[in-house]
Amino acid sequence: MNPRQLEQMARQMQKEMMRIQEELANTTVEGTAGSYVTVTMNGHREIKSIKLAPEVVDPDDVETLQDLIVAAIADASKKAQELAEQRLGPLAGGMKLPGF
């Protein structure tokens, strides 16, 4: 493969990577902690919303609510990670990408 072909392939991969990054920014996943907390996050792991079931808001038990929020964020983050790996996997050739 000559240098010109390599450069063309690199540009094509970069263009595809940018397209996938934009797609990840516009794709959301939901993480949950039971039916009490739902966290919506995009493919870049940016939290877009947190929904709480009214019955979970108990001023006498704030710790449980905090634990549920953390669990829902962790669940959403895992799903966003899986989404990114799925979309970027073919470009990465099976390599683990840091930050994804």
From Swiss-Prot:
GO CC term (a single one): cytosol
PANTHER family in UniProt: NUCLEOID-ASSOCIATED PROTEIN YBAB
Organism encoding this protein: Roseiflexus sp. (strain RS-1)
Record flagged with keyword Plastid: no
Subunit structure and binding partners: Homodimer.
Annotated family: Belongs to the YbaB/EbfC family.
One GO MF term: DNA binding
Keywords assigned by UniProt, alphabetized: Cytoplasm, DNA-binding
Location(s), subcellular: Cytoplasm, Nucleoid
Top-level division of the source organism's lineage: Bacteria
Any matching Pfam family: YbaB_DNA_bd
DNA-binding is among the record's keywords: yes
Signal peptide residues on this chain, from the entry's feature table: none
Lineage start: Bacteria, Bacillati, Chloroflexota, Chloroflexia, Chloroflexales
Function: Binds to DNA and alters its conformation. May be involved in regulation of gene expression, nucleoid organization and DNA protection.
Primary location group: cytoplasm
Protein's name according to its UniProt entry: Nucleoid-associated protein RoseRS_1534
